[in-house]
C-alpha cells in the first residue's frame, strides 16, 4: 500500500489541504480505498470529530481487507476520541458479532443511544448483521431506519447492495435511482448505478456519470469510472480524456496509472503511455501489470531489444499467471530478433492459451515466412483467413497469395501448384477491390512465372488491365507502369509487332527518359 500511496504524496504539493473527510469518503465509497486511506490519515491531527470519522473509515477499509484486529482498534480509538460519533460503535459491534454477540449488541445500543432516530445508523447496523448472516436482525434494523426516515438514501443503497449480492442487478439499479431521487447529492448512488450497467448497457452508465459530473464537476471518482467504462467499450479517445481529467486532480494510485497507461496504449499513443508506465514503475517497480504493459509498449514503439530483454525477465516469475497476449508479444519480439524457432514456439503457446484470437495465426505465418518455411506460412495464414470467416478482407487474400507466390520461387517441384493457387487468390483481390491495381498486377506476375519465356503471353491481359488504373497517378506508380510497359513491349517484340512494341518502350521513356532497357530495345527495333 505504501508504494501505491507514494504518488499521492508527491501530488500533495499541488493540491489543497483538505479541511474535512468529505473527499476521503467520496473516494472510499467510489471504490478507491488506497487514496481514501491516505486522505483519512491526513485528518488524524484535525478536530476530535474529524478524527473520529476518519478512524471509522480507516476501520472500514481494514475490515474490507479482512484485517479485523486493525479495524477494531480504529473503531475503538475513534470512539474514545469523540464518543458522539455513533458509527465507531457500529463498527465495533460488526467485528464483535463473530465472537461475542452480547457485547456486539451493547455496542449497537450505544450507537443508537446517541440519536435514536438516526436512520443511517440503523442502516449501518443492518449491514453489520447482514454481513454476519443474521438476516432477521438485519431486517429489524432496516425497519427501524424506515420508521424514522423512509427517505434516507442509505436505505436504498443498502437494499441495492443486497440485490446485487443476490444477482438482481435490475432491482439494484432501481434502488440506486431511489437513493438519487431522495438525495440528488448522493454521489455514491450514481457510481453504484453506473457499475450495474457498465458491462450490459454502458450507455446508461455513461449517462449517469455525466449527470453527476454535470452537477459536481469536482467529483474526481466519476471521471475515473467514466474512463473505465469507455475503455471497456473500446472508446479509447474518450477514455484517455476522462482519465486525463481524473489524473489532473493529483490524487491517484498505481492502479489508476495502469488504467490510464492502458487506455493510452490502446489509443496508439505509445510515447504518452510510456511516460505513464515509467511514472508507475518509479513508484512500484515490481508491479506485474506495468511490467506487462511496458513490454507491449516497447514493441509498438519499436524498442525491440529493450522489450525482449524485459520479457525474458518477465517470464522468470514462477507464480505469475501469463495470458495469451504475453506469448504473442514474446513471439513478435523474437521475430524481430530473427530468433524464428523460438518465436514460433512462443506463438504456438499463445494459440494454446487462446486459439480464438485470429491475429496469432497471422503473426505465426510471418515468422514462418521469415524463416523461409513457406509451407507452414501458407498453412498458418490459411488458418487465419478461415478463422476470420466472413470478416476476411481483400488484403488477407492478397497476403496469402503472396505467400504462395514466394513458395513457388523456392520449390520448383510444387511451383506450378503454388502459382495456380496464388492466381486464384489474386483474382479474389481483383473481384473485391476492382479499383485497385494490386489484384491484376499480381495475377500478371503470377502468369508471367507460369510463362517465363513469354511464349503464350499469359500475363498480357492482366498487365493491360492494370495500366488504366496506374496511369491515373503516374508519379506514384512509375515503377509498376514501367513493369507493365516492359512486359508488353517485349511481348510485341517477340510477336514481331514492332509498331506496338515501340509504343510501350517509348511509354517507359516518357516516365523514365534514362531507362537503359527501353533505349536498347528501341535501338534493336530500328
Which role does the model predict for each range below?
Residues 2, 18-19, 513:
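Intrinsically disordered, low-complexity peptide-like regions
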Residues 16-494, 517-526:
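Alpha-solenoid helical repeat scaffolds
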Amino acid at each position: 500500500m505504501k508504494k501505491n500511496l507514494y504518488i499521492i504524496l508527491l501530488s500533495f504539493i499541488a493540491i489543497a489541504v483538505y479541511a474535512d473527510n468529505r473527499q476521503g469518503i467520496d473516494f472510499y465509497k467510489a471504490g478507491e480505498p488506497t487514496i481514501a486511506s491516505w486522505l483519512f490519515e491526513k485528518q488524524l491531527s484535525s478536530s476530535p470529530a474529524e478524527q473520529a470519522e476518519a478512524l471509522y473509515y480507516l476501520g472500514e477499509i481494514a475490515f474490507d481487507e479482512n484485517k479485523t484486529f486493525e479495524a477494531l482498534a480504529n473503531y475503538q480509538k475513534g470512539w474514545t476520541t469523540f464518543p458522539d460519533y455513533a458509527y465507531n460503535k457500529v463498527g465495533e459491534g460488526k467485528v464483535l458479532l463473530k465472537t461475542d454477540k452480547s457485547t456486539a449488541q451493547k455496542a449497537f445500543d450505544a450507537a443508537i443511544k446517541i440519536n435514536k432516530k438516526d436512520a443511517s445508523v440503523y442502516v449501518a447496523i443492518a449491514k453489520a448483521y447482514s454481513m454476519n448472516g443474521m438476516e432477521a436482525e438485519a431486517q429489524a434494523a432496516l425497519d427501524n431506519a424506515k420508521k424514522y426516515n423512509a427517505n434516507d438514501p442509505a436505505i436504498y443503497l443498502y437494499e441495492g447492495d443486497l440485490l446485487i449480492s443476490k444477482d438482481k442487478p435490475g432491482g439494484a439499479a432501481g434502488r440506486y435511482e431511489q437513493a438519487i431521487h431522495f438525495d440528488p447529492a448522493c454521489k455514491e448512488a450514481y457510481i453504484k448505478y453506473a457499475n450495474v450497467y457498465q458491462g450490459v448497457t454502458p450507455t446508461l452508465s455513461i449517462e449517469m456519470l455525466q449527470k453527476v459530473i454535470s452537477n459536481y464537476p469536482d467529483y474526481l471518482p466519476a471521471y475515473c469510472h467514466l474512463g473505465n467504462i469507455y475503455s471497456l467499450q473500446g472508446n479509447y479517445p474518450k477514455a484517455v480524456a476522462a482519465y486525463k481529467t481524473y489524473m489532473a486532480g493529483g490524487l491517484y494510485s498505481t492502479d489508476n496509472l495502469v488504467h490510464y497507461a492502458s487506455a493510452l496504449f490502446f489509443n496508439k499513443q505509445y510515447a504518452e503511455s510510456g511516460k505513464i508506465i515509467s511514472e508507475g514503475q518509479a513508484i512500484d517497480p515490481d508491479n506485474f501489470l506495468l511490467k506487462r504493459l511496458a513490454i507491449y509498449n516497447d514493441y509498438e514503439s519499436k524498442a525491440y531489444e529493450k522489450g525482449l530483454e524485459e520479457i525474458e525477465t518477465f517470464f522468470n516469475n514462477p507464480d505469475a499467471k501469463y495470458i495469451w497476449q504475453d506469448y504473442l508479444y514474446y513471439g513478435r519480439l523474437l521475430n524481430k530478433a530473427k530468433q524464428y524457432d523460438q518465436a514460433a514456439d512462443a506463438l504456438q503457446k499463445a494459440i494454446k492459451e487462446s486459439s480464438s484470437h485470429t491475429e496469432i495465426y497471422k503473426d505465426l505465418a510471418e515468422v514462418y515466412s521469415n524463416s523461409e518455411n513457406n509451407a507452414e506460412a501458407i498453412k498458418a495464414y490459411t488458418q487465419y483467413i478461415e478463422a476470420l470467416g466472413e470478416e476476411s478482407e481483400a488484403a488477407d487474400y492478397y497476403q496469402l497469395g503472396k505467400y504462395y507466390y514466394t513458395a513457388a520461387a523456392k520449390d520448383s517441384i510444387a511451383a506450378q501448384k503454388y502459382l495456380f493457387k496464388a492466381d486464384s487468390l489474386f483474382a479474389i483481390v481483383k473481384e473485391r477491390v476492382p479499383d485497385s491495381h494490386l489484384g491484376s498486377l499480381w495475377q500478371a506476375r503470377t502468369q508471367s512465372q507460369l510463362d517465363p519465356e513469354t511464349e503464350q503471353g499469359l500475363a498480357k491481359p492482366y498487365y493491360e488491365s492494370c495500366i488504366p488504373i496506374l496511369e491515373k497517378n503516374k508519379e506514384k506508380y512509375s515503377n509498376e507502369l514501367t513493369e507493365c510497359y516492359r512486359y508488353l513491349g517485349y511481348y510485341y517484340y517477340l510477336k514481331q509487332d514492332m509498331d506496338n512494341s515501340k509504343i510501350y518502350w517509348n511509354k517507359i521513356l516518357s516516365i523514365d527518359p534514362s531507362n537503359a532497357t527501353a533505349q536498347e530495345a528501341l535501338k534493336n527495333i530500328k
